[in-house]
Amino acid sequence: MQEGAASGPRPVEVTRAGSGLSRIARTDRAGVEAATEAKRALDGLPPSYGFVFASPKHDLAASLAQVAEVSGCTDLIGATSAGELSEKGFARGAVAVLLVHAPRSVHQLAFGPRLRGGHAETARELCRDFEQLAATARSRGWPHSTSVILLDGLADTCERALKQVMLETRPFQQVVGGAAGVDLGLNTARVGMRLQASPDAGVALHVFGPTRWGVGIDHGLTPPSPRMSVALKMTVTKMTGNVIEELDGRPAFEAYQRHAKDHDVQLGPENVAQYLITNPLGVYFLDEIRSVRVAGSVTGTGGLVCTAELAEGSLVTILHADPRNLIEAAGRAAQAARKNLDGAAPAAVLLFDCGSRGMALGQSFDREVAAVRDVFPDVPMAGFLTYGEIARFRGRLDPWHNSTAVVVAIPE
């Protein structure tokens, strides 16, 4: 457990933050530049903890070490990413850093290995000393807590691990974060804590303080119109692991073929993966689409390989990504995060945004970052494009999301 305050010049009793983004291609310089920029913004205040999001073109462990050396802070968590961002914009092949000086807080870092083969044990490792931290916070009258979780996004057990985290922390624990991603052509995602980085793992930062962190989510995806040949609601009639074999008793991929035809798209090997990713599945709860799932590939029998399991009998539809709607949704998520600060001033913002949204928006993704920035002007921000978004807070019980913008506001 670490106290939020640290020795150094001019301690203040409110949270302050600084961010940095480096587009330098050389790993031995990118982390240094991003950390130097973030440290400069703190104006001499010592960071309590921080976040490092790096393209897999950079060595994540090396980036963590560079940030630690420059900032003097080793309480860092990080992830590889499909794109990096700060309040200055969006980049690929970059390193993004957020350093937070939080004197009125206590926090704890944890690392959990073997996510694929032992997700329950991974979650237990991430929360092993959570109750001890909670007891310390209670003794100081600090009731609010948030867990930032980063997981290997190429593991198919992320959602199950998160459900175990819910059991290992406390009822209605607020949990945010994202699943580490990769650039096209790379196949190993990593998460990191302090000076180590590993695939097939998870990391956590648990923070307790006197003020609630604000969280907001939205996706802006739209269901098909009644005029289209794809049903507004389809039933998952056969599921094998995380593969949807059948929708309404037919090979699941047939629904996407009909959807593509409605949009004058001819699906082939060269575009099917992108079409699946940018037109994800919406999952209904009663008559409301409550979650989104991405199918990343198709099996030889027409099954859809998803990022997480769905229960047989689930009702789903195929959603469409209109760029304007995506950008507006990010703005709404930011507004919700600001509202959920309950009147507190924001010190920093984290943005966990899906890689599929980056793919759908392309060069326009800067506009999504700007939509968040418009709600939080002059507030340091960092984030990354994920392979799955994590947000469980008041009003939202399901922690795992796809194709969604998650905005997290850290209060002063």
Where are these regions (language model features)?
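Small-residue-enriched flexible segments
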Residues: 2-49, 53-70, 74-75, 79-348, ...
